[in-house]
Design a protein with these regions (language model features):
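N-terminal leader/targeting and accessory segments in enzymes
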Residues: 1-41
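Phosphate-binding loop of NTP-binding sites
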Residues: 31, 37-164, 168
């Protein structure tokens, strides 16, 4: 934790140990049982206060390109940095969102079943885009059907009356 602060961090969420004395934590350190879930919850709270459309993008390939095209085309939009598209990167990006942005565009990657569900539940997109279902990521997902199932997890977390954009064929 001290290394993080010496490298410029201003706040830390750490895994609390049973024998940890909460009074000895620094004021800018939060000890929790599950740091990933705590980070996700903070991101959800931030996004609940955002009034613009939230766009979630996943797929075997084309995620970053699609994100970049949308970001270039939507004035004053926010998008995930580079490909910070996992359970740590996406919530961190959400916490950097300026509530004055016109739209928020999030890229979501997956290495295993449940990854897209976890990420899309954080952002609860108004628009969900699946760019492509292909043979990439087969190592963790076993088959093309596995890739389809994982990428389709996005659909279940699109807001009511939201829009899903999926490939044809």
């Amino acid at each position: 934790c001290d290394d993080a602060f010496s490298n410029g961090a201003v706040f830390a969420i750490i895994k609390a140990k049973k024998d940890m004395n909460a009074n000895k934590l620094k004021d800018n350190t939060l000890g929790v049982s599950n740091p990933e879930k705590a980070l996700a919850k903070l991101a959800q709270v931030t996004l609940k206060n955002f009034t613009g459309p939230v766009i979630g993008i996943t797929g075997s390939n084309g995620k970053t390109t699609t994100k970049n095209i949308l970001s270039a085309g939507i004035k004053n939009s926010f998008s995930t940095f580079k490909n910070f598209n996992n359970e740590i990167g996406l919530p961190l990006c959400a916490l950097m969102l300026d509530l004055k942005n016109e739209a928020a565009i999030f890229e979501m990657g997956a290495a295993k079943k449940g990854d897209i569900h976890f990420l899309s539940k954080i952002i609860q997109p108004d628009i969900g885009i699946i760019t492509h279902i292909g043979h990439s990521h087969l190592l963790g997902l076993n088959s093309l059907k596995g890739v389809l199932e994982v990428k389709s997890e996005l659909i279940h977390n699109i807001k009511n009356n939201g829009t899903a954009i999926v490939p044809n064929g």
